[in-house]
């Protein structure tokens, strides 16, 4: 288990002290995939680096596996850090070493013998799907394969926790999905706790059990991923989820929708369905009852934490009174309705 207690981090700036983190409190159970999301500059990377004390917090405590890392002497802290692996956006591989030797590096530094190194590294290469590339150099493999080397290297010391700091942000969408699938498999097969930093809500949706939303160094929302997607409370969370919708709309359509919103001639709605509501004709029933025009802009059906989850972005038009009645009816049917004021 990871516990962050009253964590604050201040850095000196050109005009005074800057609060990168402010009174952060989080509890992450063993074996969970926990996401931390926020805009650029929200404090995500600072937060994840406090977990292994790469960045020592100005105030507060970091408890990992029952030990308060902030109280440990240097030698004990080095030992504790061996139980915390980390992967980064940049792969940080040594170009003069093969795939095998890059993965073996932490074990060599720990003084392991060659036989022990081979016994540890070969299964890891098999786990990440790189057995056939073990004798290649970083320049001879793809970006996704380089990140797999980074993951295997982070697992070499048999950590209980894996920290991922924007590990997929430099990868293409298909490679990102394959890396996230690998992280889920590692979590499932090794029982590893994974803390994943990202600015992409799609990444959170694909792999995480729970999520915390960070803004200006503060946790503004936290909960199960399915709950946060269905009913986001904070404006930052709503904007991040709205980005998932907006990114799917062609630029010309975004412009037309934005113009209609300015003139007040339409209502941009996000409708979220879960469970049995996904395959029910709720929308068509609403149109018939209240004589509305629904222009479907974007829709998808996905699965989050084993539950069917449907999301629609629609532009609704009709008499104002009937629009209000229709939204009330949708909510009565268990549909989560959010009226969006803009599309970027």
UniProtKB/Swiss-Prot annotation:
Its main location: membrane. It is a peripheral membrane protein. The keyword Membrane applies. Residues 2-241 form the ABC transporter domain. Keywords: Amino-acid transport, ATP-binding, Cell inner membrane, Cell membrane, Membrane, Nucleotide-binding, Translocase, Transport. The keyword Cell membrane applies. It catalyses: L-methionine(out) + ATP + H2O = L-methionine(in) + ADP + phosphate + H(+); D-methionine(out) + ATP + H2O = D-methionine(in) + ADP + phosphate + H(+). PROSITE patterns: ABC_TRANSPORTER_1, ABC_TRANSPORTER_2, METN. This is Methionine import ATP-binding protein MetN 1. The lineage of its organism: Bacteria, Pseudomonadati, Pseudomonadota, Betaproteobacteria, Burkholderiales.
